[in-house]
């Protein structure tokens, strides 16, 4: 078991402000090599070649707002959410001219390998630092789940098409799950909580969206474009009915049609009352989600879908909220599945097949195996700080009163990839040396950590 912080194998230095998000992308069709996409506190989006460890692309958001979240959508599309309350989607394209740009204050010149076009931009509430969820529902068409524009305890859902700024359509507005959920939890030990709190994290898993809240509650829902609920107004008084009575009965059957409804399919209270800090798809089961909080629990979540995305025949077994936007089975209970890990205050989590990367508030990233044994500890220590234990002795300049204290840089984001082992012999425009380094990189698992001093570390596991 590892007990000490190890010296990182590689350190990427470009950002002058805190690294706020990192995403590793292995898309050899479009990027040719694995890349790392990083964002920082001054609005810089950077794409790195992780084989050469060099910057390939830099995009600076106007007025330098902090970048909150990054998502790679495939096909060289990158979504970026920033503190100027905007979600931007960039379409990258290989720049044959390879424009030269200044990449840092030391006036180093770097080739800009990509050019970009902003293919969509939408205002998003970022007062609570939550991220967003994007789902591709048709070619160049997406569904967005984000915080409500006025209340960060509620969510909005939009649909839009790329390259058509006037295509934005709000499907649902101000959805708050509290009243629906409290009815289900009324007879449980946590039934007295008065609100879910602000949304902390979104995570999409296929057609499901997990929402983690400040209260520690996790809710998973699926989107239903059309929902039919059948009720019968006819009161049967006799078992023998004429043809006319049967006709009247059929006419008295009322079918209510609801559009754009959300069905809650899963609830977890495992972290209550501690806030949800991060969510990650399990690398061992892509239908399972892991969660972290301020405690030492890693929540395990898997929604069980029983009836598919179909209309329900009646509403007897379901609760429909007053807004007619949310539906849930009356028998749905709360899950509390979790595993214990040897750390607390886990601000970031990334699941790997070999274990997990856990980014702690203490400035240390812990890599644990599948038995939750610590494999590696990653961190960056600031220069020693001299501290005087006594004000009187400091006047006397007594060296015995001086002690050395070390402080870690804060961790802002973690990521990781499993060794994939792929055939790279067919890749063009890559030297034998780069092929060898690429093969070595892809055959290993990696832990990537972004720190508040602007550095990004890469360590093999």
From Swiss-Prot:
GO biological process: chromatin organization
Leader sequence residues: none
Family: Belongs to the WD repeat ASA1 family.
Subunit structure and binding partners: Component of the ASTRA chromatin remodeling machinery complex.
Name the UniProt record assigns to this protein: ASTRA-associated protein 1
Annotated localization: Nucleus
Keyword Nucleus: yes
Keyword Transmembrane among record annotations: no
Record keywords: Chromatin regulator, Nucleus, Repeat, WD repeat
Function: Component of the ASTRA complex involved in chromatin remodeling.
InterPro entries documented for this protein: WD40/YVTN_repeat-like_dom_sf, WD40_repeat_dom_sf
Placement of WD repeats on the sequence: 14-58, 84-123, 224-268, 271-311
Superkingdom: Eukaryota
SUPFAM superfamilies from the UniProt entry: WD40 repeat-like
A GO cellular component annotation in the UniProt record: nucleus
């Amino acid at each position: 078991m590892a007990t000490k912080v190890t010296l990182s194998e590689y350190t990427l230095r470009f950002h002058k402000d805190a690294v706020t998000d990192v995403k590793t992308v292995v898309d050899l069709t479009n990027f040719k090599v694995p890349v790392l996409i990083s964002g920082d506190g001054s609005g810089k989006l950077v794409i790195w070649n992780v084989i050469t460890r060099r910057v390939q692309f830099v995009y600076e958001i106007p007025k330098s707002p902090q970048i909150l979240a990054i998502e790679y959508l495939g096909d060289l599309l990158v979504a970026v959410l920033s503190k100027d309350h905007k979600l931007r989607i960039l379409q990258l394209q290989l720049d044959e001219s390879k424009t030269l740009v200044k990449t840092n204050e030391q006036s180093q010149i770097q080739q800009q390998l990509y050019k970009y076009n902003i293919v969509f931009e939408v205002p998003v509430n970022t007062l609570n630092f939550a991220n967003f969820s994007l789902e591709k529902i048709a070619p160049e068409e997406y569904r967005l789940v984000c915080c409500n524009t006025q209340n960060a305890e509620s969510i909005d859902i939009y649909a839009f098409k790329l390259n058509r700024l006037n295509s934005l359509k709000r499907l649902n507005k101000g959805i708050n799950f509290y009243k629906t959920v409290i009815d289900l939890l009324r007879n449980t030990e946590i039934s007295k909580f008065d609100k879910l709190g602000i949304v902390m994290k979104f995570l999409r898993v296929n057609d499901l969206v997990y929402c983690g809240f400040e209260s520690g509650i996790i809710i998973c829902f699926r989107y239903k474009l059309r929902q039919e609920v059948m009720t019968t107004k006819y009161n049967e008084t006799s078992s023998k009915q004429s043809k006319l009575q049967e006709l009247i009965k059929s006419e008295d059957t009322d079918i209510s049609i609801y559009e754009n409804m959300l069905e809650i399919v899963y609830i977890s209270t495992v972290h209550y009352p501690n806030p949800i800090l991060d969510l990650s798809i399990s690398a061992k089961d892509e239908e399972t989600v892991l969660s972290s909080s301020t405690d030492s629990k890693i929540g395990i979540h898997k929604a069980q879908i029983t009836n598919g995305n179909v209309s329900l025949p009646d509403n007897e077994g379901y609760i429909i909220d007053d807004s007619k936007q949310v539906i849930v089975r009356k028998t749905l209970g709360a899950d509390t599945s979790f595993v214990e890990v040897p750390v607390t205050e886990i601000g970031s989590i990334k699941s790997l097949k070999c274990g997990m990367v856990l980014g702690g508030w203490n400035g240390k990233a812990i890599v644990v195996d599948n038995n939750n044994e610590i494999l590696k500890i990653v961190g960056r220590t600031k220069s020693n700080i001299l501290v005087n234990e006594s004000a009187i002795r400091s006047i006397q300049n007594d060296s015995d009163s001086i002690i050395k204290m070390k402080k870690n840089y804060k961790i802002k984001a973690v990521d990781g990839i499993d060794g994939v082992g792929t055939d790279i012999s067919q890749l063009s425009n890559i030297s034998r040396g780069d092929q060898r380094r690429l093969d070595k990189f892809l055959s290993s698992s990696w832990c990537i950590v972004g720190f508040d001093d602007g550095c990004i570390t890469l360590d093999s596991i």
